[in-house]
């Protein structure tokens, strides 16, 4: 049974200072923000009180520190996340794996609202993998983050053992093994692509530095916030201590949409579509690859004989899917994006089925396709299920596909020049061109 200890000097105060908090080892951590207690006053205490909440003899509560006459603990929490659990002491949890730390930025947003519960349920990392969620938000979203934590608490997920929330990436990213970076500024009316690249680039430069400083040395990073390819490049360039191949830009939603469109055209269920690749940037220059994709094990071009549709209508249908969804529903694709994040992570922690592959935006150094190095480019990958991947070598690239890939490559090179001041590669120069290639529904 949990036991709370109050260590109090002789001098007393009529109430527990509102900046004091119970310390939870499976915890909710409010970084840079101090929340009023949800509990009534306990005992009289003083600014020098030490408060702990524990179910293990060896757990140690942080000492409360005095600042301008107020007590502030370095870590904070509430509710069930305050309890310290010895997972090896219970028969049910003894066989569980070691707890892993997962950071999510933009944690108060709609995508995260769908994603966090999938992570906590065990759907992503498995039914024997306990997790700690580290939720990064802003000062403006801190109350919403508390609401998210309350919903996670009420959901009674056995595998969810810790929840921290905060606004400082240097604290939130401490010791994380996975970082899912969703938070980014949306594109406002009249905002140029170059402005968006710079504004969001600064966010991801800061987060890259924080990951470099605080995260696990082998942390896996999935960048979702747009423009995700170049944001991932900025992030990895600011994290030199982390292997560049550990950074990913999310293009799995594009892959899922492409599979859906091919299945619809062929009149089959979408699980019959395999070997789907999205090449290049997460933009209208992306290249859904029908040349190497298969339906029921057969080349797509043998199943779908309308080759004009493949070359024109297919790509357009993938690119415009997000915009069409907004027209129909009045909101962007948060739920399907969350599902694609789950798919992207599971593709790295689950062995790839024999003969198949998946798409993810990764660093191009050493690629076998002749794509310019120093970019984050979506390419076909396989994984052994250990969190790492290898590029697929046995793919066909004809002249048509090569020309399309080159167009996306040129766009990413232009974006890279535009953020050179954020990657440490010189003075920025923007020559993005007059055509707006941001995907509909993601501006």
UniProtKB/Swiss-Prot annotation:
Pfam families: Ldh_1_C, Ldh_1_N. The record marks 77, 82 as: Activation of NADP-MDH. Signal peptide: none annotated. It catalyses: (S)-malate + NADP(+) = oxaloacetate + NADPH + H(+). It is found in: Plastid, Chloroplast. Induction: By low temperature and high light. Residues 1-52 form a transit peptide. Its main location: plastid. Its EC number is 1.1.1.82. One of its GO terms (cellular component) is chloroplast. Disruption phenotype: No visible phenotype under normal growth conditions and high-light conditions in short days. Substrate binds at residues 187, 193, 226, 257. This is Malate dehydrogenase [NADP], chloroplastic. It comes from Arabidopsis thaliana.
